[in-house]
Amino acid sequence: MGSVENRRAYVERGSEAIAYLIGLGLGLSPIDGFADYYFPDAPGSKADGRYLEPLPFPATLLGAWAERTTVGQGTMTTQHGGSLLTNAELTRAAVDPDGIARRKADRAGRGERCMGSGLIANLVHMAAERGVDMWTASPALRLIGEDRVEGLIVGGPDRERRVRADAVILATGAYDWSPELVEAHEFIRDMYSLTPPTITGDHFRLASQFRAKTATTLPQGCSRHVGIHIPGESWGGRPLYRMMIMGLPHCVMVNAEGRRFGDESFFHTYSSTAYAFDGHRQRFPNWPAWFVFDQTYKSKYSIGTIAPEDPLPEGMAMVADSIEELAALAGIDAAGLAATIGRFNANAAEGVDPDFARGSKPWSNGWGDSRLPNPNLGPLTAPPYYAIRLGRVGTGLASAGLKTGAAGQVIDMADRAVPGLYAIGNAAARIEMGCGYNSGMAIGRSLVFGYLAARDAVSIRFVEARREPVPMARDIRV
């Protein structure tokens, strides 16, 4: 499935792109002990060392740009979160909350940013050091040109500006904040997003001037999550939903019938079943869904930004002294929920999950409680019991995007590259990936195809000017 040429470009040129960026000053480090999603089942998978994450970056180096760069809202975290922890530290948050709190305070005092916020801060700093013009509050309105792209018109506080350019690279993200596009391509409604509110599908609008072709992948291959809303928190004028990876013990996720429908500790197993449609009954059997946990969970682990010792905000959860009472409050089938919890508890006491193999994957174990024999399993036996209704949460990876060539060239309806127009990241269809998903995929393809698109654009300009090729650094590896 997908494009063999694009896949080969990603695999064969990926390390070259990373080496180039490291050479310019991008700080990256492997995450020790963090297994591939599908290890050991997938051929070639590894126990650790394949994931790279940004090194903490001091925002004080950004000067005026420190206030202009986005800081994450902590939506990607299950326990403590924010932009003050690395992924490696997040996996230890459940077992060392005091140490993690000290680390966060220390980072905040030094003005350091981690994860995506740290990556962006580092890249902006690299660009600023080299005199790259970066315009804020300057939306791209339309492209310039007829047979080829010759620039674009951008908006601004006072007037529109006409910018001439030999090439334009669309890196606008997907369309999470466009309800029409989400419904058209993802076939769902009421989806919240971890992305900034500016992600509205501008790439489709801009590229339509040149009859650009779109391509799609299976929605089940996208990074679709479920999340929780903490009352009072908002993002872009909408309720903020924090992504949940329910890898800790003493909790389950159930549908309205009270049944589990996936391995809660490995979100890719339920990211498809949560969105599955039953053609016979003409409904979504696993939606709505609830996060159900007991007092042991509440006393041991944080929920979003809520520490174990803090009460849940009013209206966030249903609370009851029995499973049956909880089901009645939440609107869940009481007999079904009681049967599910009873079976789950009996199996969890033995450290197994014969229904969905929860706790059997090394990747999932890394998000659990390493103090327990099975880091992902523990019974729900301590009242009171809690139920939080979940929301659908997108992460910016979309089923549809612009069709591109192996160097990011936008392809038109006649299957020809549009001269001077490129699309990368989530603006480009994931035709090099097929229907699989792995963390870091969006950033990885953005970095690699951004590098390849820029080189291609520069090489064409160079050839047109000098009539000679640009040498490529094909032998660089990391």
Cite the ranges covered by each PLM segment.
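A glycine-rich dinucleotide-binding beta-alpha-beta segment and adjacent secondary-structure elements
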Residues: 141-148, 336-431
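Glycine-rich loop(s) and the adjacent beta-strand/alpha-helix scaffold that form part
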Residues: 110-117, 129, 156-232, 278, ...
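C-terminal structured subdomain/cap of oxidoreductase catalytic cores
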Residues: 159-164, 306-310, 396-464
